[in-house]
């Protein structure tokens, strides 16, 4: 299982998103658990980003909610860390 690292920008966007849509909080936390267990689980629709966001990845929470993240080497060894960068609608994060 990979370790999730919540970047400050992700933490802020998560709070804003769940304040606007409280029902999303549990769904997002479930997706984060799945992401830590298997980032390429088909239900997440994980994909590489291109252009200005090259080097980052995104996964699907629901129709108009995406999580943007990066794989970083774990200084302690083992599986890569997943650094959570942003969460929001398609137009907000891309």
Regions found by a protein language model. Name each.
Residues 17, 35, 71-72:
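Hydrophobic helix-cap positions at the C-terminus of alpha-helices
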Residues 1-31:
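Arg/Lys-rich, positively charged N-terminal/basic patches that mediate binding to nucleic acids
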Residues 31, 45, 55, 63-65, ...:
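A generic structural signal for short beta-strands and their flanking turns/coil linkers
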Residues 3, 22-25, 60-94:
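Enriched for short, Lys/Arg-rich terminal
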